[in-house]
Amino acid sequence: MEKVLVFGHKNPDTDAICSAIAYAELKKELGMNAEPVRLGEISGETQFALDYFKVEGPRFVETVASEVDNVILVDHNERQQSANDIESVRVLEVIDHHRIANFETSDPIYYRCEPVGCTATILNKMYKENGITIRKEVAGLMLSAIISDSLLFKSPTCTEQDVAAARELAEIAGVDADKYGLEMLKAGADLSGKTMEQLISLDAKEFQMGNAKVEIAQVNAVDTNDVLVHQAELEKVISAVVEEKGLDLFLFVVTDILTNDSVGLAIGKAANVVEKAYNVSLENNTATLKGVVSRKKQIVPVLTEAFQA
């Protein structure tokens, strides 16, 4: 049987990795030869979840067309966030919870996108719809994805469906969602030992906003100063990325997981758009973004609107 690769976006977060594993397992149960893979490094937070539930991480690939003809995308749809040669393969399915942009296919596909906080929440429904029991380890990874995307149910992207799914999955996994979740988020917020290049690419996504090319990277921290103490070095590596990719804006967002506020570091010729979008003034290229924790709901649409205004 021909193999199908299942993967999340570049610079994968916990949902991108764990949903690839969970959906590949569901597809295998339904008779498909599916393998989860990843398009980037595994973060400390994701590694904590994999280690905790004793699951091996997916192997790394940059291109897919040399291996397979067909792929399934989870947790993304935009071409620039996907495999480098995504145009050379057929996308069979997309399971996602983000905006739909820069995406088209030549054939009809199964496309499931729901306004929930996490791809794993959708997969929880799909396991039920297909009458497949979720293994304990996989339930733990799916729970981890929801906790990560919802910042332990505090993000404005978090819905009642996400909370309900997390409680169900926690029961299957045999963990206390709140206790485990805080441990996992703290593991993800431990940025010691990371290079500046790693910090700005741990969870980075590229977007087309009007005519502007924008990259938004986000890291969680227990104290934003632990990251911003390195601002001069961060600006140097961000400026190099801006030049290399021809970006109009690179916004590096440091989110405090205890206060649920963020600090944005804006570099690029369109940095002033951040000021316009949030009605703030950049001082030394940074501004506090009160109550902003979600890239999907509080950054991407706000900046997109500002660029198109």
From Swiss-Prot:
It comes from Bacillus cereus (strain Q1). Its cofactor is Mn(2+). The lineage of its organism: Bacteria, Bacillati, Bacillota, Bacilli, Bacillales. SUPFAM superfamilies: DHH phosphoesterases. The keyword Ribonucleoprotein does not apply. This is Probable manganese-dependent inorganic pyrophosphatase. Mn(2+) 2 binds at D15, D75, H97, D149. GO terms for cellular component: cytoplasm. The keyword DNA repair does not apply.
